A protein has these predicted regions:
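Structured, active/binding-site neighborhoods that engage oxygen-rich ligands
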Residues: 1-392
Length: 392
């Protein structure tokens, strides 16, 4: 595609902005039991940072590391896919799939990534490592255990940044749910707007960026499935009152390995329209995706939901509030839900009261360390990524 219309650009901007809003909305309630949040959640800060009121957390900080790399001039023409990478035949025997069984298609031979694409992955990995390295200065607070272990090992390693991260992630891969945290899913949404119109390239990008910290099939799958849903929501020609349905998320199953599609179809179907606190929002990537999806779909049909009020932006607000009520890892569940809600309703649907106070830390433009950015900065950044990366 050659251009985006105004509505698509608004939805592209909504991906990053609504993620940050969900993140900041969930921060104060992290660790609460499912369903324990009484009344509408508010951006009052605190949490595990602790964070200032209306400040986003590590979820959005890592997403902004990716966004900053996607905007870097070193990425030629936005061509971020690894076109020459074959499927599982060239992959190393590492990583785990469902139930802890080895998944030979997971950890790919990253040496096959073309140099023009490797430059982007290096840029993302370098920003992750810089983010991690400034923890003592107040950036990178509340880092997940798995992400911390991988980035710590990668920081001490040798070679190109992406190669160090991929290697460290593979070395720290664990079986079962413990090795499949939600630290990649929480940051994946922005990748959806990097190659709009090219689902295969976007899926490859989502897999490889996930693998920088999490070498697990469930993490790859969840990132691919969610990123694809976000991208299609940005590009779709929605009618004013049209809501997100089960088929929208299931449409991404064709991008997953055939042997894992049944697992994900069950996960989607059993969480559609369910009260999110019945799923919970703890750190396993599959549970997080299910909780976010439940919050989105349940809030559309709930008595206090958005039926008849879609054009007012209530769909986005109700969905994020429902995500926080899932409990557990509330900032991450709401951040993930925000990616897709923003892709459906757009940046223009974000309540002005949230937009006025939202802020947080992001990579310093043109250097190392961080700077503070606000809602308007995220919109500009997302629009730039979307326009730069249009697939030909």
């Amino acid at each position: 595609m050659s251009a985006l219309n105004d509505e698509q650009l608004d939805r592209a901007a909504g991906v990053l902005l609504a993620q940050a809003c969900g993140d900041a909305l969930g921060v104060p309630y992290e660790g609460r039991p499912p369903g324990a949040v009484d009344g509408p959640p508010v951006m009052k800060g605190g949490g595990l940072g602790p964070y200032e009121p209306a400040e986003w957390s590590d979820d959005t900080e890592m997403a902004l590391c990716i966004a900053d790399a996607l905007c870097a001039d070193a990425v030629p023409g936005g061509d971020v896919c690894a076109d020459a990478v074959p499927d599982g035949d060239a992959c190393a025997d590492a990583g785990m799939g469902h139930g802890g069984a080895p998944d030979h298609s997971l950890v790919r031979d990253h040496a096959l990534v073309p140099d023009h694409a490797l430059a982007l992955y290096d840029g993302i990995a370098r920003r992750f490592l810089d983010w991690f390295g400034h923890e003592s200065e107040g950036w990178a607070r509340d880092i997940g255990i798995q992400t911390r272990e991988v980035l710590s090992a990668a920081a001490a390693g040798e070679g190109r940044p992406a190669e160090r991260c991929w290697r460290a992630a593979a070395e720290h891969a664990g079986g079962g749910e413990s090795g499949a945290g939600n630290g990649a899913l929480m940051r994946t949404g922005v990748l959806a707007i990097a190659r709009l119109g090219d689902r295969q390239a976007t899926a490859e990008l989502a897999r490889r960026v996930a693998a920088l910290t999490h070498a697990h099939a469930d993490v790859e799958d969840s990132s691919v499935l969610w990123t694809d849903a976000v991208q299609r929501a940005v590009l779709r020609d929605w009618s004013p009152d049209e809501l997100l349905g089960e088929d929208h998320l299931l449409a991404g199953l064709d991008l997953l390995p055939e042997e894992r599609r049944d697992f994900w179809e069950r996960a989607v179907r059993e969480s559609t329209g369910v009260e999110p606190w019945k799923i919970g929002g703890w750190g396993y990537t599959v549970t997080t995706l299910k909780a976010a999806w439940a919050a989105i779909t349940w809030s559309q049909d709930a008595p206090d939901g958005v039926s008849g009020a879609a054009s007012t932006g209530e769909g986005l607000r109700h969905g994020l509030e429902a995500a926080v009520r899932a409990g557990g890892d509330t900032d991450t569940v709401a951040a993930v839900a925000g990616q897709l809600l923003g892709a459906r309703w757009g940046a223009s649907a974000v309540p002005s009261a949230w937009r006025a106070v939202l802020h947080g830390r992001a990579p310093h433009t043109g250097g190392t360390g961080y700077e503070v950015r606000v809602a308007a900065d995220l919109e500009v950044l997302a629009r730039r990524i979307a326009q730069k990366g249009l697939a030909g």
